[in-house]
Amino acid sequence: MKLLTLNTYSWVQTADPSLFAPLVADILENQYDAIALQEVNQLSTGPVINDPVGYHATQNEIPIKENNFAYFLVKALAEKGLAYQWSWVPCHVGYDIYDEGIALLSKVPIQSVEQVQLSASNDFESLHTRRALVLETEAAAFVSVHLSWWKDEEENPFLREWASVETAVKNLRSKKPVYVMGDFNNPADVRNEGYDLITNDGWQDAYAVAAARIGSATVPPAIDGWEGNELSLRIDYIFSDQPQAVETYEVKFDG
């Protein structure tokens, strides 16, 4: 099985779709079984797309808009002959003009999708609102997340959010493998915080067990949300609830 997780930061720095050609090419080459995406944006004022091909909705309040990044990506891949089924969950307003959310793409048929509330805040206008997307196929379940920092304005929202993820997948874990993928905003080398919480709960980090590793850090210093940070960080993960043999772990698109 091949998996990919990516914080796309889509459309914020550029509206030129050609700049995402390397991502499309990489997916075409690797034929990932499942892809988790974060910061999947669409212009709030964009035209609505009715019945997008392959789309499985979890809610009806915020429809798919014309420049939804997951929709753009699925279309670009379909034009090259690679079909994905997919889902998208809107989380909160981004940069005042976007509906920002998370997405999952699956190469095999989707059995079910679910939107899970993680944060105490459920206000779409609040940047503190966090949600997860749970997608189930016949063979496995996948979760896309974009979680809070360990400490955010002197509070610890991460504890609540991770507990909500575990509650959401509790019943699935007895049926099939579960993979939680995404941007966790918690560095792997910081002890007694988010990373240790997850691994101590029995989740396996793909990087930690990979037979071969190409790269480590997933973000450079001083990105949005980590202003003032001077080090490259590993904050994006693929966790599995069961021990898995991992042949290769590779960092891509880390700029």
Question: Can you say where each PLM-predicted feature lies in the sequence?
Answer:
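Beta-strand-turn-beta hairpins that frame and shape the catalytic cleft
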Residues: 1-4, 97-102, 106-112, 127-145, ...
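N-terminal, active-site-proximal structural segment of metallo-dependent hydrolase catalytic domains
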Residues: 1-98
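Surface-exposed cleft-lining segments at the edges of enzyme active sites
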Residues: 10-13, 116-124, 146-157
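Active-site environment of divalent metal-dependent phosphoester hydrolases
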Residues: 11-13, 42-44, 94-97, 150-153, ...
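Active-site neighborhood of phospho(di)ester-bond hydrolases with catalytic His/Asp-centered motifs
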Residues: 35-38, 87, 179-183, 205-209
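Conserved beta strand-loop-helix elements of the APE1-like EEP
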Residues: 72-80, 96-113, 227-246
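His/acidic metal-ligating clusters that form di-metal
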Residues: 131-143, 155-191
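Metal-dependent phosphoester-hydrolase catalytic domains
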Residues: 170-178, 186-255
